[in-house]
Amino acid sequence: MTTTKTMLVAFVLTLFFVISSVHCSDGTSGYGITEATKRCFTPAPCTRGLFYCQTFCSSLSAVLIGVCESGICCCILNQ
């Protein structure tokens, strides 16, 4: 009886250890579901020129690139 309880406890602890050590990826293959790669703002940053639009986008995040499209500043995710 004692051996059975010991084996059961050892099995459960081993199972918990194995489950906790498994690393799962939350990424998806292909394009998948990702955050928006482009966000456009009011034309105010582009009225000062492309450099100001780029500065505006990089101030939001270091991975964004600013582009003026039809006078509207769009921040694009740098991939």
From Swiss-Prot:
Keywords per UniProt: Antimicrobial, Disulfide bond, Fungicide, Plant defense, Secreted, Signal
Any one GO cellular component localisation term in the record: extracellular region
Disulfide bonds: C40-C75, C46-C68, C53-C73, C57-C74
Localisation per UniProt entry: Secreted
Gene Ontology BP, a term: killing of cells of another organism
Signal sequence annotation: 1-24
Similarity remark: Belongs to the DEFL family.
Protein name: Defensin-like protein 117
Lineage, highest ranks first: Eukaryota, Viridiplantae, Streptophyta, Embryophyta, Tracheophyta
